[in-house]
Amino acid sequence: NTECQLSFADATRKYIEAGKDLEGKGFEFSKRMLKEDLRWHFRRYGRDGNVILIDFKQFFPSVSHEEIFKRHEKLLLNPDIRKIGDDVVNTVSGGVGLPLGVEPSQAEMIAFPSALDNFIKCQLSIKCAGHYMDDYYVIVPPDRDAKEIMALIVAKAESLKLTVSKSKSRIVPLTKPFRYCKAKFILTETGRVVMNGNRDGVKRARRKIKAFRTKIQNGEMSYDDLWTSVNGMLAYFESYDDHNRVLRLRRLFYSVFGFSPERIENFRERGKKDEICCA
């Protein structure tokens, strides 16, 4: 089983734009690739051009087993490993779909759209394109027809039995903000790429901070756990250009708890005071 997983990983590692659950990759990798692609485009074309955003419906539940087996036959040259891979896929009945959250499934679905990736990069000669699992971006130069390119990409995806979500797929001029994987990207007139985190995350973070106060008062949460939770939320926004959001959340925390969330010593001192009071 381990050898099979390593084979899947080796088969997918070369598709560097497919950032998901591989060592050194993930959403941070995908964000960095998109920023680099936007800067590369800006140095040559300014803000002229468009970005195509594509999302697939039911990416895991609807994947074709037949198409996966074709990939196995091409990439897994060891027949024993190929049989193990086929058997893993066949654990899902009906000829379609793979389970979420299972490592072999993740490896399969990282590599599965590679034919589409190669089509975009090689046959369509698009320099700036990438994806995070089923979320694709394709940056189209101003001398190319974005609608035509999108139609070709959709046709290629459908040949792999992938269903494009028409409601989530669109063409956006680079002069306007766009969302990719729930993050907002803005290419400014100076070529700077501004990234903002998911705005709904701010509302959730505010609710959680207020709820943590009740948990602390009821003894359901320690100050060490509070430190971990709050700074995890702040770290998410600190990874974006969301300085003002971070400041507002820190101010809310101070108004609720009466101390700054920036130093772990503040949490430990408050925890010791509570222990003394309880004793």
Predicted regions and their residues:
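Polymerase palm active-site segment centered on the conserved acidic dipeptide of motif C
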Residues: 128-131, 138-215
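Conserved polymerase palm-domain catalytic core
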Residues: 32-133, 137-152, 172, 223-242, ...
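Glycine/proline-rich, flexible active-site/cofactor-binding loop segments
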Residues: 1-24, 85-92
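Hydrophobic recognition helices of helix-based DNA-binding modules
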Residues: 3-4, 120, 186
